[in-house]
Amino acid sequence: MGFSKRPLIKKNSDEERIEWNEPLQAGELRKSQIITTFGPGAVVDLEKFSGIIASADLWERAYKNSNQQKRIPESAKIHDRNLEHLLGVRYFLAPKTMESNKNSSNHLSQDVYAFRFPYMHFCPACGRLDVYWKLGSGDNDFTTCRHCGKKHKLIPSRFVAACINGHIEDFPFNWWVHRGKTQLDHKLKIRFNNTSGGLESIIIHCDTCGKERSMEGCMSANALRGYKCKGKRPWGGKSKEVWEKDCIAGMHALQRGASNVYYSVIRSALTIPECRDPFYQLLDDHPELLKLYQEIKKTPAVSMTGLLGAINSDLKEYLTKYGLCAVKEKFERYSAAGNEDYSYEKLREDEYDAFCGGDNKDKNFRIETSAVPEAFTPFFKKIVKVHKLREVMALVGFRRVLSLDPSDANNQETEKLKAFNRELHPMGYIEPSIKKTEWLPGINLYGEGIFFQLNMETLDKWAAIVRDSGRYRAMYQRIPAGSAMQKVFSEPYVLLHTLSHLLIRQITQECGYSEASIKERIYSTYPGRVKTMAGVLLYTSSTASDGSLGGLVRMAETDIIEKVLKNMLDQAKWCSSDPLCIESTTQGYNSLNYAACHACALLPETSCESFNCLLDRVAVVGRHDETGNISGFFELGDLGSAAEDF
């Protein structure tokens, strides 16, 4: 990441600004962090300064400047046909890196840029508060205060202002201290009282007029009412050309390191092999062939045959064997299939079919069926060892202030979200690139896991009992209208999701992985769709191409997984918060959990795909007391010898 060494002050009509050249190494981030926590538009404390990660379209320039052809090399592009189809892009692009050591898994980024942000800094010696290029002097680090002359590292402002449309700027200290009026030429100072550590101890003082005001109350919902958003997008640079005009959203004061400054929006897919025509598989592996065909398809037949045959030996063989007409028909069918609507539901259904379809030895999808323990055959149809998988993770955008999609808001949030600009951001999030690109930021993750397919006959029997009881009717009614949770909710989903959490908590006690390192994918029949699903994938993944070490896969051995399942059920019967937990139907966000709390079923947020919602231990183990008689899934079959352990 970098910013320029030499400052060049330029005058604008209403402010001074600074331009930079000659990149300076500012700090280091892991490649996966740039796709998740610290993606384009995120504010991050780097080694050299506090900065905002630059727009992703700058990655393209970095790649093109690194080779004589001035284009992104094919080796840098990440392909996953299903995810490309879903998101409407041609490929995914990882942050440009260099290996620090051939024998090391560490990678250093050379071409991911960051701009210094926030602009407002203060001198720890005299307290002067101003934009850093006016306040400090120095070759590139602004270590000398122009006001007091003392050499100190300037400290970036703790506060920023942002709106739900993604715009972010310096907190308006001048406007704040003058209570709604901006006095451009007034000089500000900041001081800290030692009376407490709260916001009331931070005092903003105007040297020019003598007014002062503490920061107490600046974080309240209406603190910046009357302050108009300027549409600033500093991750695109300081030029006003990247500002968005006429934003009507209210501004909110945030602390620059707070989680609500940046919520990344991630989409991912597992790379699964397809039982496809070998010609279509060739086009999957070499997407540049389709691009070439589209460019030359109107040329004369002789010229087209020569051009296509020259670029790829396999394609030349097809032309020789089947002729140009047959090959053109294949190209057209492949192209038409790529233009069909493809949904996230279909993507999950394709993944589910791949896990249920038998053993596979594909380089990115190596699975092996493991025998289901005899005691658990009424409940599980299949248990699969996932020796290797590849997950393509893409950053599709980000949000500020609120994490939910504008359409997912509950009644308390509706007022804030009325100003979200759907015209500019139709998907409900801010895109990672300011300039339109044909790609999205993405990375490959490799790992291992275990897949559990439930017995559909037992599941249907349990679901019918629970549905008749109406146990989850209130849970469904509490889900925000139009939200992702509403789109997946069903009685089986609650069971599968809870089972997944309980299994992860138990497996981490047996295999040494932490809960945060294991993720879940729930495969449950989507409401309104014909395809039936009932499965859970637990997996771990990392950017290392060799994946992980096999510890999780080993848990799928028949004798080991039998022990894990027995212990899981034993643990699930009791919670340290019982009887309050087991009797509860109003826990968690929006009361979307029943018998599930931190002591028994909740996981780190990185592990859960539904924000630790839609959980209920009773779905797994049942509950029988004077207040209710509710059957759990694992009570519907004969556990045989397993029952002796309970």
Label each region the model flagged.
Residues 146-148, 181-254, 258:
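Intrinsically disordered, low-complexity regulatory segments
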Residues 2-177, 187-193, 242-646:
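Extended, well-ordered protein cores
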